[in-house]
Amino acid sequence: MLIIETLPLLRQQIRRLRMEGKRVALVPTMGNLHNGHMKLVDEAKARADVVVVSIFVNPMQFDRPEDLARYPRTLQEDCEKLNKRKVDLVFAPSVKEIYPNGTETHTYVDVPGLSTMLEGASRPGHFRGVSTIVSKLFNLVQPDIACFGEKDFQQLALIRKMVADMGFDIEIVGVPIMRAKDGLALSSRNGYLTAEQRKIAPGLYKVLSSIADKLQAGERDLDEIITIAGQELNEKGFRADDIQIRDADTLLEVSETSKRAVILVAAWLGDARLIDNKMVELA
């Protein structure tokens, strides 16, 4: 497994792979890898000849400096996991390598609408940072496919739109959420939970599933469903942050013509902001 930290060396390797006619898959990550990331890697391996995993804690997508400072950097352990998975290339650049003149004056990519709604409204600049780094990685790696987790539902929708709008010839693969046995969605942020909070955390998925059951049973008073869900989260020990029921295809408000809904839930548990989602067919 090659570990590359600089743009010139990465370009050199990508040129070689292209000359050899290899099909390349990219899995962009911020490191602190868990089994959910490994599922992305496995999906990439099944679809391509060569798998490139990027590990970069992107300062442009953090709206709070303290979150950036405390995000775990576990490069050695991450590389060991990826090596066991037989990943071909890890791209692990420094911030200076990606943003040589800092982030303030760096050219950015913005996806209007999707970048400022829902999660984007509570995390200003976050999605602009995501679309900027992902587009840069696409330009550098030139993958045939790229794999992203469906846990970050809005991020996946944003990347799909960016790819369509910018004309990237890249297949975007959404990989289903991987959960612990108790239902908790795997996330790097789960590492912020204390042992006691970890016992409470599966309650998020239980509330999410309860909303889904109500929708599938034909309930359509969304305001009431959301209010009750928020109360249930707070009773379980969470601080409900945002609960939304949206059209799964547009992320706009659910309408009479909506065929699928996505339930998006965000809640604080101690210092960890947990997010999860679930899709529901609207008959």
From Swiss-Prot:
One Pfam family, short name: Pantoate_ligase
Binding-site residues, beta-alanine: 61
GO terms assigned for molecular function: ATP binding; pantoate-beta-alanine ligase activity
Swiss-Prot/TrEMBL catalytic activity: (R)-pantoate + beta-alanine + ATP = (R)-pantothenate + AMP + diphosphate + H(+)
Pathway: Cofactor biosynthesis; (R)-pantothenate biosynthesis; (R)-pantothenate from (R)-pantoate and beta-alanine: step 1/1
Name of protein: Pantothenate synthetase
GO-annotated biological processes: pantothenate biosynthetic process
Organism field: Shigella flexneri
